[in-house]
């Protein structure tokens, strides 16, 4: 050990036994809001044209308490054919996450990238079951890389902010 280096036990983050390592845990997951509309039943089951499926999603976050955050995944699906709307589905699927000792710069990447990734398989199942229960073949949503989407959005915001600052 070099003379300038402190022993490992002196550089530990806590001397009183308090755990200062980042900890993340999912406390609960739940359907916050759900709607399935089949406005043209029973005629829709005789339509000759396959509906076009439009899927939109959004992620929202909210701090509930000091170390408690909610991430919510909103999925909106419209299936439309030339004859009309086959079905419309709206799902708001949330998760409650305990985040302790997580650095401020890691909160948004977790809440907008990792948390939706954890919630998505369960929301996907709700969607597939609801569409099937509505009398249609189950709709299996393709996996979404939420972390990559978050990084792209953050990069676009930085470029936009730099462009705005450069033109001011």
Describe every region a protein language model picked out.
Residues 2-118, 122-168:
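N-terminal intrinsically disordered, cationic/polar leader segments
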């Amino acid at each position: 050990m070099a003379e300038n280096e402190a022993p490992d036990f002196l550089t530990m983050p806590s001397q009183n036994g308090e755990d200062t390592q980042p900890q993340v845990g999912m406390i609960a997951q739940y359907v916050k809001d759900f709607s399935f509309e089949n406005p043209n039943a029973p005629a829709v089951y005789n339509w000759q044209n396959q509906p076009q499926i439009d899927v939109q999603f959004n992620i929202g976050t909210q701090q509930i308490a000091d170390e408690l955050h909610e991430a919510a995944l909103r999925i909106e699906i419209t299936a439309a054919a030339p004859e009309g709307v086959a079905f419309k589905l709206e799902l708001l699927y949330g998760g409650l996450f305990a985040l302790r000792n997580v650095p401020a710069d890691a909160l948004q990447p977790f809440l907008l990238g990792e948390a939706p990734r954890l919630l998505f398989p369960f929301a996907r199942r709700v969607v597939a079951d609801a569409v099937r229960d509505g009398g249609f073949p189950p709709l299996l949503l393709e996996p979404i890389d939420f972390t990559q989407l978050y990084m792209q959005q953050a990069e676009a915001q930085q470029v936009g902010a730099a462009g705005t600052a450069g033109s001011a």
